């Protein structure tokens, strides 16, 4: 007996926009996203990221910020290359939202606690919470990335680089970890390594804020000083 693979019913794009747009346009974002969550799965919404209408692609990316899971990361990373800046902006937001929530519940809670410490400048406490999160879930890429940020803010750049690498091992599309590694190399005046990281970050997210400027500055520095490492 042959078992047929389960199929996912496609969403009608016009129905999708008609159902969600009124709440969005009235500013009731939560109502719109609650409706999306109740009607469609992430797998269905992902298909709309390639639809010809930019508004459909944008609303699909916004919806994935709430219902998306690990399977939505690769399609959203493709959406970072969309010709419409509004779509790439929402895709970036959706990726951050997914990255922060796809760990085990205990690890997600510890990362939130660590972020609170980091916000108040308590970097060692933040690092301890992020480390605890990693013990709870060794595959939680964002725990490594947040620990990298805490190390960066406390000027422990080598440790930050190592944690960026650990994050990227688990989430290769993590433009934040890649650009963060570039910042660390720049602070260490390792200009060629910084340039390499910035180029890779832009390959993932071509419109990543500030990175093209940093890359241009390093390119100019290396042109003016060819002996610099």
What are these regions (language model features)?
Residues 2-16, 35-50, 69-81, 104-111, ...:
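Amphipathic alpha-helical scaffolding segments comprising HEAT/armadillo-like alpha-solenoid repeats
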Residues 66, 97-101, 119, 153, ...:
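Register position in tetratricopeptide repeats
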């Amino acid at each position: 007996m042959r078992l047929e693979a389960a199929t996912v019913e496609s969403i009608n794009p016009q129905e999708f926009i008609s159902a969600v747009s009124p709440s969005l346009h009235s500013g009731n974002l939560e109502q719109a996203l609650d409706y999306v969550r109740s009607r469609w799965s992430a797998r269905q919404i992902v298909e709309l990221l390639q639809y010809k209408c930019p508004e459909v692609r944008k609303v699909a990316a916004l919806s994935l910020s709430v219902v998306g899971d690990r399977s939505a990361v690769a399609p959203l990373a493709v959406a970072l290359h969309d010709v419409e800046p509004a779509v790439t902006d929402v895709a970036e937001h959706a990726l951050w939202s997914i990255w922060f929530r796809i760990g085990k519940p205990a690890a997600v809670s510890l990362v939130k606690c660590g972020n609170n410490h980091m916000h108040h400048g308590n970097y060692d406490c933040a690092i301890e919470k992020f480390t605890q999160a990693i013990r709870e879930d060794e595959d939680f890429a964002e725990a490594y990335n947040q620990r990298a940020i805490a190390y960066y803010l406390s000027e422990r750049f080598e440790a930050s680089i190592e944690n960026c690498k650990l994050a990227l091992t688990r989430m290769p599309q993590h433009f934040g970890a890649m650009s963060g590694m570039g910042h660390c190399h720049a602070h260490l005046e390792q200009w060629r390594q910084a340039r390499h990281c910035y180029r890779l970050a832009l390959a993932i997210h071509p419109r990543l804020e500030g990175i093209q400027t940093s890359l241009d500055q390093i390119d100019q520095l290396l042109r003016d000083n060819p002996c610099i490492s």
